[in-house]
């Protein structure tokens, strides 16, 4: 079980590493790209225990409404907002406009 969970986390981290600067993805989107659309909560947990916050940009993941995490594990909501804004992502009242900033990976 631990090995399976480890492999799941690695898939999640691989997807999150692909989110470009200036873009965000939702937990559900990361779950789908990692192989299972039902993993949205697993994505949240994996990012909460992210072993490499500098190399795995978990701050680029928001909820399905575009809301940043009120409990961002690496400095709180204001830190997540600051990191996103430093990349040019506008955050208004803790929300990102998904129509403008959501990552649309080429799935070919």
Residue map of PLM features:
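Nucleic acid-binding interface residues in structured DNA/RNA-binding domains
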Residues: 2-108
């Amino acid at each position: 079980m631990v090995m399976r969970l480890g492999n799941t986390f690695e898939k999640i981290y691989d997807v999150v590493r692909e989110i470009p600067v200036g873009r965000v993805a939702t937990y559900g989107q990361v779950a789908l790209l990692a192989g299972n659309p039902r993993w949205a909560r697993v994505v949240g947990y994996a990012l909460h225990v992210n072993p490499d916050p500098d190399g795995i940009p978990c701050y680029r993941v928001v909820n399905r409404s575009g809301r940043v995490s009120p409990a961002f594990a690496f400095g709180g909501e204001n830190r997540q907002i600051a990191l996103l804004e430093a990349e040019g992502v506008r955050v208004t009242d803790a929300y990102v406009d998904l129509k403008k900033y959501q990552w649309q990976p080429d799935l070919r």
